[in-house]
Amino acid sequence: MNLGMSSAILSKLPRVGLALLLGSNLGMALLFANPHSAMAGVITLPDGGRCEGELSEGKLSGSGICQYANGDRYEGQFINGKPHGQGIYTFKEEGRYQGEFALGEFNGKGVREFANGNRYEGTFKNGEFDGTGTFTSTNGIRYEGSFTNGSPSGRGAFTFSNGTRCEGDIKEGKVNGKGVCQYANKNRYEGELLNNLPHGPGIYTFAEGGRYEGQFSEGQFHGKGVREYPNGNRYEGEFVKGNTQGQGLFTFKEGGRYQGPFDNGEFSGEGVREFANGNSYKGTFVKGKMSGKGVYVFKNGDRCEGEFSDGQFNGKGTCIYANGDRYQGEFLNGQKHGQGSYLYADGTKVEGNWQQGQLQK
């Protein structure tokens, strides 16, 4: 084809297609165009990339496509040679972005899909997640809320792969501050969090009943607190890494209580146990049971002092009875057993060997 083709044919062609029809370079195309009007053309970038689309004053303005030298690709709107408006940017190896652009950056609403399967949908500012959005990762973590400079910040909620959902104040990409966590087992926490875990004062409510209110550390009961159990029992005192540890008061629903030291959830050390029937024990406990030196007082006034083991009066001891009688000797499982002497209130005294509470003749 040559420039001698009929003027009638040329007059029917749109101006935006003239450069491509003539097969000329961009400079020749501009000879036939209004320098301030849009026309179609091709631009070769300094690094070898190639762009084509609507041109104005030698720059892409309007719809266009750029294939960059690094393998990335953009298709969408341009202003003054930069992506601006709606478009799709496809990375050679890092997924793609679809949404709004401003002056060459992701700006406004959009969707960023990563090659590893991670996905963000929301608002962008200068190429970063910024504003409100949702980030979903392939490892099962989902975040909905506010972002600043590419990271979760402000108010938001994390949903983890195990079903736990925590929402609240977001700092440094995690829930740090006041928040609420709903767990997969239907348990619930409300209070202070650090790095998505209960930390500081808070309340933990169990789905099956009962609750804990007090101090937490790295997701565990730690410090002073109150634990109410579903069976009605109650503990108030110190906790260490989730267990009752240190000084505390344990109250039983049916009556009675224990006050003293705990070790790994059990009565341990010098404490006082008051029973629902009115009896009481003051002395040493080991693994939750009376064991060691102690004094056991019955509701009726009987009093036994001596050695205990496995929750029973075992070993040497003395019992002073409410009627004035007195026994001193050996015991087994709470009964007189072994050598002992029995002094009656009237002064009568018997000594001998006892078996299961009975004097042997």
Predicted segments with their positions:
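Conserved anchor residues at repeat-unit boundaries in beta-strand-based tandem repeats, strongest
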Residues: 51-60, 73-84, 96-107, 120-129, ...
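C-terminal segment of classical bacterial N-terminal signal peptides
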Residues: 23-37
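Bacterial N-terminal signal peptides that target proteins for export
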Residues: 3-24
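Short N-terminal segments immediately surrounding and downstream of signal-peptide cleavage
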Residues: 37-57
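Ala/Thr-enriched low-complexity intrinsically disordered regions
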Residues: 102, 115, 123, 132-138, ...
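Threonine-centered tandem repeat motifs in low-complexity domains
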Residues: 1, 44, 65, 88-90, ...
